[in-house]
């Protein structure tokens, strides 16, 4: 989850951070130099790690414009009083979607309220979807024996007007997507 939290900062500062890279990408299960690695393999199999899925969620949910996102008038950077929450928001003008990414790095459930201010009066947000990546056990990862132990799960979500409220489970990375009609 810390990787997801870090990447909210990259996205919030997209005017300065133009690219990021991930290394090392591959690791053999019987011989590696360091962790983390994105994809583990042996002679017959490969497995995607949670790091892979975090990177994938960012790559598949990038926007064209970074939006301001604040909590108590401050960027959501896990600062004191923000309860381990890190977040970023983007607008994808090609898909007409508002996308909010939130990482809860704390060990407690956190209430979330997304208030989409500044929309035109005729703009209506459709019910959206949430894609979550989570594990209560911070030491758990996908393995060759359990390749799908931690994978993104998608669920529909409902929004009332321009406000979406929910609770985010501990050690969870969530991507919320709403289409502007």
In which residue ranges do the predicted regions lie?
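A structural signal for short hydrophobic beta-strand segments in well-ordered beta-sheet cores
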Residues: 89-91, 157
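C-terminal beta-sandwich/jelly-roll accessory domains of carbohydrate-active enzymes
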Residues: 74-84, 103-181
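C-terminal catalytic subdomain
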Residues: 44-47, 58, 84, 93-106, ...
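Alpha-helix capping/termination and helix-coil
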Residues: 11-17, 59-66, 93-95, 106-110, ...
């Amino acid at each position: 989850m810390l990787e997801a939290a870090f990447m909210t900062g990259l996205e919030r500062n997209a005017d300065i951070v133009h690219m990021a890279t991930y290394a090392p990408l591959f690791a053999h299960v019987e011989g590696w130099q360091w962790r983390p690695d994105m994809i583990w393999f042996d002679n017959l199999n490969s497995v995607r790690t949670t790091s892979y899925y975090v990177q994938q969620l960012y790559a598949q949910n990038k926007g064209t414009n970074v939006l301001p996102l604040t909590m108590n008038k401050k960027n959501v950077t896990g600062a004191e009083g923000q309860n381990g929450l890190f977040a970023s928001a983007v607008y994808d003008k090609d898909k007409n979607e508002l996308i909010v990414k939130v990482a809860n790095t704390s060990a407690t459930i956190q209430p979330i309220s997304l208030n989409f201010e500044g929309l035109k009066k005729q703009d209506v947000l459709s019910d959206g979807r949430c894609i979550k990546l989570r594990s209560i056990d911070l030491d758990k990862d996908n393995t060759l024996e359990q390749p799908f132990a931690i994978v993104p799960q998608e669920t529909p979500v409902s929004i009332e007007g321009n406000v979406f409220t929910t609770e985010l489970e501990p050690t969870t990375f969530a991507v919320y997507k709403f289409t502007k009609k």
